[in-house]
Amino acid sequence: MKFCVAVSLLIIASMAGVISVSGYDVYPRDYAGNYYYCGVRKDPDCSKVCKLHGATVGYCHVKRCSCVDLPEKNQNFLSVIWKQC
């Protein structure tokens, strides 16, 4: 019973974006440290945002852009720009 509750909480937390399993859902941040939000009228194209940060592909997940295979060192926008200079 306790195992089922623990697994259920783990699944709910990973779906809500509270935790990431195996580094799959990594949310990039802009220059001010904010997440890129999507699902609104002027939403950014998450694939373009994630490729700018060095990830392979991106998608909208829980109203935030999520990147696949995004290195944690490239999560912040300024760290990516600093490497290009």
Swiss-Prot record:
Location of this chain's protein in the cell: Secreted
Keyword terms: Disulfide bond, Neurotoxin, Secreted, Signal, Toxin
Molecular function GO terms recorded: sodium channel inhibitor activity; toxin activity
Main location: secreted
Keyword Signal: yes
Keyword Cell division: no
Gene3D superfamilies: Knottin, scorpion toxin-like
Disulfide bonds: C38-C60, C46-C65, C50-C67
Coiled coil: none
Leader sequence segment: 1-23
Domain LCN-type CS-alpha/beta: 24-85
One Gene Ontology cellular component: extracellular region
Tissue specificity remark: Expressed by the venom gland.
Annotated family: Belongs to the long (3 C-C) scorpion toxin superfamily.
Protein name as it appears in the record: Neurotoxin 60.35
Organism the protein comes from: Lychas mucronatus
Species classification: Eukaryota, Metazoa, Ecdysozoa, Arthropoda, Chelicerata
